[in-house]
Every structure is written in structure tokens, then in C-alpha cells.
Design a protein with these regions (language model features):
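A late-sequence structural motif
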Residues: 7, 159-196
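Short beta-strand-to-loop elements that line the ligand-binding cleft
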Residues: 22-30, 119-129
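Short beta-strand-centered segments that line the small-molecule binding cleft or hinge
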Residues: 4, 10-14, 31-69, 73, ...
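Ligand-binding cleft/hinge of the Venus flytrap
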Residues: 11-20, 42, 106-120
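N-terminal winged-helix
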Residues: 1-36, 147, 186
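Short secondary-structure boundary segments
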Residues: 50-51, 75, 148-150, 178
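Secondary-structure junction motif
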Residues: 7, 93-117, 182-187
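Flexible hinge/capping segments at coil-to-helix
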Residues: 58-69, 73-95, 183-186
Length: 196
């Protein structure tokens, strides 16, 4: 999605300067569809949310961003005035989830995360991308847990607040064929500095 690509914008820019002749194409899709396309050789690389992604032995990855998670909530919601939000204050409020995180491990981890926060019974809503999630949240009817750096996008009508006692990080991964000898893939991967 847009967020995942955003995590590697500077590397794409640098790669394009180094290899102006290279043809770069972008394809959006769910984690499952992108992993499937990688496995079938239809893609050279994919940038995915690392939450619950299980890579087969034929794939390798680099972390493009490891980002603290925060609550994204409407700026007009009373909780937006707080510096930090306790999970119990979110009880009963619908949660907006990103449909792109469609693998069973991802869905299970996300469900477990909300359950550990005491929010197992909150109604779920689904959207196809971060902008749609932000628009739903802007209405004041729902919230979501998001990577903190999404706040840099300047999305009007939403705010980001830490969740008391919640220290999870969102990891985004560049995924590529393990041991690839393709010079384009190797050159691009070398631009991703190792992160924790």
C-alpha cells in the first residue's frame, strides 16, 4: 500500500538517480497477493507490512521501518485532547482495520493485539488503504492503531496519541528472492540500511 511504499521513497529516488535506465513499476495489493506474485516470479521485490508476515525459505527481507504504534483518532473526538489514551477508554468504539493485512498470521496477531488491550469485543470495520482508514476515523466513529510516522503525512482531521502500556512496533519489510543474483535487486537491497 501507500504507507509501505512511503517507507522506501528515498531509496527509490536514490536508485533512480544511480540507474536512470531502470524501469520501475509499482503494483498495489494485499500481503497475500504480493507474496504470491513474488513466489511466481511476477515481481522482483515487494514492500509489506511485517505484522504477522511469514516468509517461505525462498524469500528474504530487510526492515525498511520499525515504528512505534499509536492510536489514530478523530481530532474532534474528546479523547484527542488527551496526551495518552488508556485502552479501556477505547472499549466499545469500532476499530478500523486495513484489508491489505489479509494473511491468517497477520489477522491472528492483530486480533491478539486488540484482545490483549481488552478490546476483543469492539466492532470491526475494514478499509482498503490508509487514506480510507483516515477518512473513516475523521468521522469520529472509529479508531485504529497505526505506525506513528503516518502522522507525518499531514492528514487533516485525525490525531495520533500513545496508548498507555502499549509498546508494539510496526515493521515494514522489503521482501525479495533469497540469494538473488539479479543486479537490480541486489543494488536496491543494498540501499536499505539494517534496522531493528
Amino acid at each position: 500500500g501507500a504507507y509501505e511504499l512511503w517507507t522506501i521513497v528515498s531509496q527509490i529516488r536514490k536508485y533512480h538517480r544511480q540507474h536512470p535506465e531502470a524501469e520501475i513499476e509499482f503494483q498495489l495489493g494485499s500481503n497475500q497477493s504480493l507474496l504470491g506474485a513474488l513466489a511466481e516470479g511476477q515481481l522482483d521485490m515487494a514492500v509489506l507490512s511485517g505484522f504477522g508476515v511469514e516468509l517461505g525459505k525462498e524469500l528474504d527481507s530487510r526492515v525498511t521501518l520499525s515504528d512505534p504504534c499509536m492510536v489514530m483518532i478523530s481530532a474532534s473526538h474528546p479523547l484527542a485532547a488527551k496526551k495518552e489514551i488508556h485502552p479501556r477508554e477505547l472499549k466499545g468504539m469500532p476499530i478500523v482495520l486495513n484489508r491489505a493485512q489479509d494473511s491468517q498470521p497477520s489477522a491472528g496477531l492483530i486480533a491478539g493485539m486488540y484482545a490483549n488491550m481488552g478490546l476483543r469485543e469492539n466492532k470491526r470495520m475494514y478499509a482498503d488503504d490508509f487514506y480510507s482508514i483516515a477518512l473513516i476515523i475523521n468521522t469520529g466513529i472509529a479508531f485504529s492503531i497505526m505506525p506513528a510516522s503516518v502522522a507525518c503525512w499531514g492528514i487533516d482531521g485525525v490525531v495520533f496519541r500513545p496508548v498507555q502500556g502499549f509498546k508494539a512496533k510496526a515493521r515494514t519489510l522489503l521482501v525479495y528472492p533469497r540469494g538473488s543474483q539479479d543486479t537490480g535487486i541486489r543494488s536496491f537491497v543494498s540501499l536499505i540500511k539494517p534496522k531493528r
